[in-house]
């Protein structure tokens, strides 16, 4: 027993003290995914969407890896993300803020060399005013709404914007862009509708480069590329197109420790509300991850984890900090206190978990909690 404790202490010293879940991020696989997209897109440039802390994987580490692969265009959602990322990248890397700026952030943004994506006349006026105050031309990107009804200049604002550009401006437009709402569905009619609307916008605003394709858009064909694509989920190993074979390499794996095992008789109630009742004598394991760690509560009695390739179904409700699984299929003693089970990895993909949870891989990936020890290789 004492030797086991000493081994445990040594192992703890080499990883993270107190962690009971280990999120492995394969930066080499990330680089290979980027190179694959670059090869598909050439000669079109490939940027990288690193918003939400690079989908939960660590924006600084991810961005530096992609920079080393030649990426120079990085997209975040909020200005605060750009502020955090800026010191991690060389000055020739451009950081774009997709949501644009809230009033009062314009001067700081300009002084840090961060580029806002302007989505409305209100944002345009604020950025133009900042340029006047600083007495210099400031760069920006214009985003247009082509049918998603979320962000971007609406149709009714385009005429006034075009007039402002014709009259001369202290804002340098680097390119114009829009976002595809249904690119993950290659057969969606909305893809063609948005393409047609973007073509009309290009006619109204001639002479500007275009950025259009997201991860799914890369696989819709060259017509959707523009001069700069903006892949996100595909970089991190997620499937860019629903229902199609995933061409990307997995980047993330997650293993979680067992806290306790037990054997219960038939008729035992498991978890909050006694929602699961065993039909036979059952061996159970409680693992150290719950909905606070990114295992959605809707996986209750639906999802699973794996141990050496054996599927271990979740039984009862997922709790905040723990989840109980049925280990009866394993030989007795195969899984014990401290053993690690696979939540995400070789036997279970992001898409598998998302399907069981009734959601999308983006939500699963970005929801992986900060109690995991993130290990990079």
Curated annotation (Swiss-Prot):
Provide the top EC class: isomerase
Its biological purpose is as follows: Isomerizes L-alanine to D-alanine which is then oxidized to pyruvate by DadA.
Q: What is this protein called?
A: Alanine racemase, catabolic
Recorded catalytic reaction(s): these are: L-alanine = D-alanine
**Required cofactor names:** pyridoxal 5'-phosphate
Family classification: Belongs to the alanine racemase family.
GO biological process: what's one of them?
D-alanine biosynthetic process
The catalytic residues are 51 (proton acceptor), 272 (proton acceptor)
Q: Does the keyword Isomerase apply?
A: yes
Q: Which organism is it from?
A: Rhizobium johnstonii (strain DSM 114642 / LMG 32736 / 3841)
One GO location term (cellular component) = cytosol
Q: Which Pfam families match?
A: Ala_racemase_C (PF00842), Ala_racemase_N (PF01168)
């Amino acid at each position: 027993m004492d030797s086991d404790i000493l081994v445990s202490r040594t192992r703890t010293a080499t990883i993270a003290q107190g962690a009971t879940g280990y999120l492995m991020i394969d930066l080499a696989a990330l680089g290979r995914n980027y190179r694959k997209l670059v090869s598909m897109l050439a000669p079109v440039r490939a940027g990288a969407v690193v918003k939400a802390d690079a989908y939960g994987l660590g924006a600084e580490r991810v961005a530096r890896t992609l920079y080393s692969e030649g990426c120079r265009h990085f997209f975040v959602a909020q200005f605060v993300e750009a502020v955090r990322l800026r010191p991690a990248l060389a000055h020739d890397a451009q950081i774009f803020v997709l949501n644009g700026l809230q009033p009062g952030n314009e001067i700081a943004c300009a002084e840090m060399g961060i580029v806002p994506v302007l989505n409305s006349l209100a944002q345009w006026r604020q950025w133009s005013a900042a340029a006047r105050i600083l007495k210099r031309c400031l760069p920006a990107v214009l985003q247009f709404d082509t049918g998603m009804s979320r962000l971007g200049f609406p149709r009714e604002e385009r005429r006034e914007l075009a007039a402002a550009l014709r009259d001369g401006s202290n804002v340098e437009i680097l390119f114009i862009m829009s976002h595809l709402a249904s690119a993950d569905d290659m057969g969606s009619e909305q893809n063609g509708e948005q393409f047609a609307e973007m073509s009309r916008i290009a006619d109204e605003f001639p002479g500007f480069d275009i950025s259009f394709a997201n991860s799914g858009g890369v696989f819709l064909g060259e017509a959707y590329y523009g001069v700069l694509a903006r892949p996100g989920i595909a970089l991190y190993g997620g499937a860019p197109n629903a229902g199609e074979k995933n061409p990307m390499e997995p980047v993330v794996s997650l293993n979680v420790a067992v806290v306790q095992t037990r054997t219960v008789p038939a008729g035992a109630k498991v978890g909050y509300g006694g929602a699961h009742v065993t039909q036979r004598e059952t061996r159970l394991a409680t693992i150290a991850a719950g909905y606070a760690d990114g295992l959605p509560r809707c996986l209750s009695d639906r999802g699973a984890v794996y141990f050496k390739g054996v599927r271990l179904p979740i039984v009862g409700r997922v709790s905040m900090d723990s989840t109980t699984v049925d280990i009866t299929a394993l030989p007795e003693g195969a899984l014990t206190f401290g053993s690690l089970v696979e939540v995400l990895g070789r036997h279970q993909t992001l898409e598998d978990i998302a399907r069981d949870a009734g959601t999308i891989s983006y939500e699963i990936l970005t929801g992986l909690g900060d109690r995991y020890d993130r290990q990079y290789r």
